[in-house]
Amino acid sequence: MNKILKGDEVIVLTGRDKKRRGVVLARVDADHVLVEGVNVVKKHQKANPMANNPGGIVEKTLPIHISNVALFNPATGKADRVGFKEEDGRKVRVFRSNGAAVGAKA
């Protein structure tokens, strides 16, 4: 089981977007994630009439390494590490600081 999944709210730990929060849009591969509003770049797109693409300057979200983000703990308001606990025969993700289940309503 992965520690960070699609739909999790994360906070960026390093880089130009440090301390910015966002929701994980997708896992690109084992160690990269797409985070909403983080690592957005402007790409100069050439027009392509065959593909009905007008071209221009397009904003694109690039992947960020999973080691540069941490799960946001709403109870503490800070970044938190993730651990695993077995509950009712299932493996559940929990916050390391307070032991609360990830995604559980407070």
Curated annotation (Swiss-Prot):
Q: Which GO terms describe its biological process?
A: translation
Q: What is this protein called?
A: Large ribosomal subunit protein uL24
List GO molecular-function terms, semicolon-separated: rRNA binding; structural constituent of ribosome
What species is this protein from?
Answer: Bordetella avium (strain 197N)
Q: Name one Pfam family in it.
A: ribosomal_L24
Q: Which InterPro entries match?
A: Rib_uL2_dom2 (IPR014722), Ribosomal_uL24 (IPR003256), Ribosomal_uL24_CS (IPR005825), Ribosomal_uL24_KOW (IPR041988), Translation_prot_SH3-like_sf (IPR008991)
Q: Which domain of life is it from?
A: Bacteria
Which keywords accompany this UniProt record? Ribonucleoprotein, Ribosomal protein, RNA-binding, rRNA-binding
The record's gene field reads rplX
Q: Which family does it belong to?
A: Belongs to the universal ribosomal protein uL24 family.
| PANTHER family recorded | MITOCHONDRIAL RIBOSOMAL PROTEIN L24
**Disulfide feature:** none
Functional note:
One of two assembly initiator proteins, it binds directly to the 5'-end of the 23S rRNA, where it nucleates assembly of the 50S subunit. One of the proteins that surrounds the polypeptide exit tunnel on the outside of the subunit.
Q: Could you state one GO cellular component term attached to this entry? A: ribosome
> How does it associate, per the subunit comment?
Part of the 50S ribosomal subunit.
